[in-house]
Amino acid sequence: MAAAAVDSAMEVVPALAEEAAPEVAGLSCLVNLPGEVLEYILCCGSLTAADIGRVSSTCRRLRELCQSSGKVWKEQFRVRWPSLMKHYSPTDYVNWLEEYKVRQKAGLEARKIVASFSKRFFSEHVPCNGFSDIENLEGPEIFFEDELVCILNMEGRKALTWKYYAKKILYYLRQQKILNNLKAFLQQPDDYESYLEGAVYIDQYCNPLSDISLKDIQAQIDSIVELVCKTLRGINSRHPSLAFKAGESSMIMEIELQSQVLDAMNYVLYDQLKFKGNRMDYYNALNLYMHQVLIRRTGIPISMSLLYLTIARQLGVPLEPVNFPSHFLLRWCQGAEGATLDIFDYIYIDAFGKGKQLTVKECEYLIGQHVTAALYGVVNVKKVLQRMVGNLLSLGKREGIDQSYQLLRDSLDLYLAMYPDQVQLLLLQARLYFHLGIWPEKSFCLVLKVLDILQHIQTLDPGQHGAVGYLVQHTLEHIERKKEEVGVEVKLRSDEKHRDVCYSIGLIMKHKRYGYNCVIYGWDPTCMMGHEWIRNMNVHSLPHGHHQPFYNVLVEDGSCRYAAQENLEYNVEPQEISHPDVGRYFSEFTGTHYIPNAELEIRYPEDLEFVYETVQNIYSAKKENIDE
């Protein structure tokens, strides 16, 4: 509506601007004010875009003040979408009225698509072609992203379904952009050694919703460099590194001067700023994200080494990365320039161990084994990133509690972007798609996504015929099942076969045995799992066995579980359930329960009334007891 009002107002500007202004009551007094005062009034923040459109149609002078490239429309744009202003240079010529219209249109289109996702993808993960509507929209991508961010920032407990799908779309858009940037980065010549830039791309890809930029991370590192320079000045006030300007890449050749830099670095990083290797929580993905390393001041050998190397190089010390087994190191050359060097001409630096300087023998003691000379060699950017992503991949294989395997999916994407012909990882990716049910909307797209991966594997390694054949068979079976699927199953509480169901979707529950908090998002009159699951979960040991209602619940730890009715009870102190899929099923949290979204309510049309009765009986009674 706002966009229509703006368009409507601006369409009449040329015709009305030629008419005499004094006919309008009080207008003559207004237009006689100095231009700066009028501009200040029009930019006061109380006027909407539609107001400005109407004002500019009253007379020529006000129209000129509201010119499309002027301050008035710039202020309208800034007030409405402040986060976008960083994308404009003060020296750029911008038609702010046109920008306003394009941004408004992009927002309306983005909301239309977000609103459609729940109905289209409620029963499955968003497929590979599910984002094509966004990709095909006309207009700057930053406008669509900004609208998605606006949706995510809506009032905390409402619009949960919109936020759920807006988050997925934003996640996808940013990851696609970051992956393209990473691929372009990997095409740089071998002598392009921006290790930090590559590490930031990995960080961004795994955390696409976070505000992470190379510029911001570099600024934080620059502030550390300033502290090192301050300490270095106390060691040697004439040190050449102190004269370096930002962005310079000069190197100092004297070993003694390099040593002074490293001493100052060790003091600032480990004594003053308290950076340290994270021995207590080593297997945490946060240790590999550079923005988290700077925030938490801890990491693992490879991330600590990249930070150390970046600072050292900015101060003129040419350290090099060493892909040492089990413990990433840096090496510092002690030999003369131009001489033939071997591994004993280097000192090896353990950034994880507070910058400790090691000999070759001490490096072997560090990992408890003898290694060949080749493992002391320097590695390029791609190999460093391969090791970082390999670490994330290992962590991703361990994690699965939220059943989305997001870290595993992200690290697989990154690894295959660098090494697209890794057969075992391609097989793992195909299995992951199959396991998660991330099926495309149409069978032809599924063939392009899953079967294409399998065909590529077969070409690379014919020996994988058995594994590929198994996955192809199951993929084709899935296509056939999708063709045979019937409509939505509706469960009515009033149905006689559901008479034993005591709880309803949206209620906050507590598990009697394990104590976890959860919200119900589905139920069955009896256990619908297979015999193997029933046996493994020891369901027969329950007093009512599998002949009782079972509930699908989202648990606060991020897992999804299937709980027997006798194991659940009302949570007398209901709280929000921080599960990533809450928005998939619910539109709002009221403080006592969740309200199902339209798609879930279609499947359980009588549950909401029962929820209201339960809330009234359980929580209102509790409040009355407290008041008494």
Swiss-Prot record:
Pfam families: F-box-like, Transglut_core2, YccV-like
GO cellular component: cytosol; ubiquitin ligase complex
SMART domains: YccV-like
GO molecular function: DNA binding; ubiquitin-protein transferase activity
Record flagged with keyword Glycoprotein: no
Example of a GO biological process term: apoptotic process
InterPro entries per the UniProt record, alphabetical: F-box-like_dom_sf (IPR036047), F-box_dom (IPR001810), Hemimethylated_DNA-bd_dom (IPR011722), Hemimethylated_DNA-bd_sf (IPR036623), SirB1_N (IPR032698)
Keywords for this protein: Ubl conjugation pathway
All residue ranges annotated as the F-box domain in the record: 28-84
Physiological role: Substrate-recognition component of the SCF (SKP1-CUL1-F-box protein)-type E3 ubiquitin ligase complex.
Quaternary assembly: Directly interacts with SKP1 and CUL1.
Protein name in the entry: F-box only protein 21
Organism: Homo sapiens (Human)
Gene: FBXO21
